[in-house]
Every structure is written in structure tokens, then in C-alpha cells.
């Protein structure tokens, strides 16, 4: 009986370890979108990663922030819900990365949106929604 209990304990610990490692490996991945397509944002891609427990989006070095009054980060989840995040342009430069809030459950698309003109400037998609 003791051997069975010990064997079950070892099995349970092994299963927990494997689950933890696979979860951590998934969070360490970098996911890249397709090329941005749109009237003003049509260069570069967006990348999603986790750093220090935070979900981050970054644009690639070849991405050009559109020269519009208020280019803004937007994400669309797998259900089609749109979330408006931060502006690309900030005083003294450009904001080429953004922290995705925890209430955004997954990301299917990344959009560049002009908040002033209320128009979509460009969009890119992940091959499958990232969490």
C-alpha cells in the first residue's frame, strides 16, 4: 500500500511539473503578426510576448508610425471585441510597445487607429489568437 501511495505521489508531482513547464514555455514564445495592411499603416509587423509577467505588443523596426493626428494601438480579440489602448505618439517620441491589459483575454488582430479622425489606418493578424 505504501508503494502505491508513493508511486501516486511521484506521478502527481511529475504531472504538475510537466504542466508547469509547458505553460511557461508557451508564455515565453514570441508571436508575430502578418504585415500591416491599410491606407496609412502598411509596413512592418507586430510581435506579442510576455516579459516580467506582462503581456506586451511591439512593432517591428521597419514599422513606420503614420503621420496622423492621433495614431493609436487597438487590439481585436477572437470574439471581435475591439480594445483601444495607448497612443503611438507621445511627447518627445514614439511609443513602439504597449502593455496589454489583463482584461484582454486574447488577441487576434492588431490595429493602428486614428482616434482623432476615427478611422482605421492599418491592421495585421496573428495566425491564431494569442493569449
Language model regions located:
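An anionic, turn-rich surface loop/hairpin at beta-sheet edges
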Residues: 79-106
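Short, exposed beta-strand-loop hairpins at the edges of beta-sheets
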Residues: 99-125
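Bacterial N-terminal signal peptides
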Residues: 10-19
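Bacterial N-terminal signal peptides that target proteins for export
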Residues: 2-11
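Short amphipathic, basic-aromatic surface patches that mediate peripheral association
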Residues: 57-63
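A short beta-turn/strand-edge loop motif at beta-sheet boundaries
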Residues: 63-67, 105-106
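Transition segment at domain starts
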Residues: 23-52, 131
